[in-house]
Structures are given as C-alpha cells and as structure tokens.
Amino acid sequence: MIKRLIIIILLFIWSCEEATFEQDNPLDPDNPDYDYPTVTFISSIAEGDTIHVSDISFDWQGSELVAEYRTKLDDNDWLEWNDQLSFEIEYLDEGAHSFSIQGRYSTGVSSIIVTKNFIVDAITGPALVFFPRRKIASQGDNVTFQILAEEVYNLSAAEFRFTFNPSALQINSLTAGSAFGSLGEVIFITEIDNNGGSVSISTAVFGD
C-alpha cells in the first residue's frame, strides 16, 4: 500500500509541472517581438504624379520574411502571388490609374494594401487614339475598340483611314460614337476592306 501511494504522488507532481516554451518564432503572432508584414514602394513616381509616356515600372520591398507579393492595376483582378519585386506595365491608356501591392508571410498573414495613384498624359493632341491601347484576345473572340479624338475641340467633320493585318483579324462593324454630342444630324460613312486590311471613315455633323 505504501509503494502504491508513492507512485501516485510522483505522477501527480510530474503532471502538474508548468511547461515552458521558447517564443522565438518570428512568424508566431504570440511572439512578443512579432511584426506584421509590410510593403513599401521604392524607385517609383510620387503619389498623384502625371507621366507623359504609356508605360511605367514599379519597384517595391517587403519587410523581413515577406515571401510573396501580388499586384493589381486599377479595378482589374489581382495577379497570382509570386516573389517578384518589380512590375512593368505597357500600353497604358490616357487618364487616371492606380497600382496596388500586397505582401504576405509563408503563414498566409497578409500586409495592408499599398496603392500608388498616377495620371497618364502621353499624347500631344490633336490626335485620334484607339481605346484601349491594347486588348488581349483569343482566336475566335469578338473585341470592341473605340477611336477617340484626343484634345480636339469644336470638331464638325473628320475623315481618316487605318490599316490592319487581315490574316489576324477582320472588322465586323463600325458605329458612330458621341463625339458630336447633340449638335445636329450626324453623317457616318464607312468602307471596310477585310481582304486588303483597311477601313475608311468619313463623318460630319450638320446643325440647325
């Protein structure tokens, strides 16, 4: 009976000992020295700057242990997470844009999103511009472009022609836009040559 009692007491004392663990894991939020991930732009334009080209590069850096980043232009979807620290954007359209970055640890903890707003003013008008400048499509897709009059004022008539590669695409239709507003009756004459790869447009407005 005495031996059994001693064994019981020893087991009880062992099970009540306080366990201690080293909290030195930098990715453990319970670590008193834990820092949340951060991302910072480097070597980029200032907030709200205007650029006079249609392409731009962004560079950034994350805090220690940030493993991946993702980026987003304007209201487009986020790109996939990767370990790149720079990104180049080409064929930007005229006007206001925003570029956003977010980083995360390997544990999945993400940083706050940082955003840089800027304006593209790459065209010195008067000029005719395709909008958007670039659109990526697959074979068989139908896509729509606009032709904009950039820095053109008091326009009453226009005539122009553009060419394209007929082995890569064909023009299905052309419609008049709203460049003339409500100034009067709009005349819109087009000629599409899908064999030769050219389009001619003549348009004018007749007011009262």
Indicate residue ranges for each PLM-predicted region.
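C-terminal motif of bacterial Sec signal peptides marking the signal peptidase cleavage site
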Residues: 12-15
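Low-complexity, disordered linker/stalk regions enriched in Pro/Thr/Ser/Gly
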Residues: 17-125
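Short strand-edge motifs at loop-to-beta-strand transitions and within beta-strands
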Residues: 85-88, 143, 197-199
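Low-complexity, serine/threonine/proline/glycine-rich extracellular segments that form mucin-like
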Residues: 136-183
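Structured beta-strand segments within beta-sheet-rich domains
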Residues: 148, 182-208
